[in-house]
Amino acid sequence: SGNLKIVGTATDSYFDSYLLQQVNGANPEEGDWQPIEGVSATPVNSSTLRQFATTTVADGIYSLRLRVTDKVGQITTVRRTITIDNTPPKVTLQSPTQNQVVSQTVGIMGVVSDANLEQVQVFFRRSGNWRSVTTVRGSTVSDRLAEWDTARLADGEYQLKLVATDGSGQPPTELTRTVIVDNTLPQAEIASPRNDDQVGQVVVLS
């Protein structure tokens, strides 16, 4: 994603020039190739050939072609295939909802999608550092993302965080939500009458 630095070598004892080209697709036709910054007459040895501004093209599979020409017109060609992905992962957290009261084992429900999704991480914290719930890997993660065991946690307000990372090196997508943990049972008491008390209407004789 972003500006891709293309590193390589374009030299010869009788070097003339090199041309770096790109095209959408893995098997392009000859006339489809587009130059990246034009022809260069300066030899390069294990250094930057060109910068490819990938944000100027659509996401997808692209072919790169380096053509090095010498003084007598001989040409050496090298090709590479890459995947451009400038679209961050899309994250939807369906449950628990914001400020929902939860207890015991909580199902974290949602959908994370991306063409090149690498992993989804789920974290929680009450304060301080984030603690991991789980890490899920796959191209698309949906429905039950994780199960969060709150049984041993103190009651109170917590934050949940989903972090989705793709394989293109761009910043991850994060989503944070506040929930309230309540594992304390309600109090219930009948103060009067006492258990097994005999009760009835009071009759006054006169």
Task: Name each region found by the language model.
Residues 1-3, 98-104, 195-202:
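Short, solvent-exposed loop/linker segments at the N-terminal edge
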Residues 6-10, 108-112, 205-206:
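Aromatic/hydrophobic beta-strand junction motif of beta-rich domains
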Residues 11-24, 113-124:
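Solvent-exposed loop/turn segments flanking beta-strands in beta-repeat/beta-sandwich domains
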Residues 53, 70, 80-92, 149, ...:
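Flexible, low-complexity linkers/stalks enriched in Thr/Pro that connect modular domains
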Residues 55-60, 151-156:
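Surface-exposed, short loops/turns at beta-strand junctions within beta-sandwich domains
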Residues 69-74, 165-170:
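Short, solvent-exposed loop/turn segments at the edges of extracellular beta-sandwich modules
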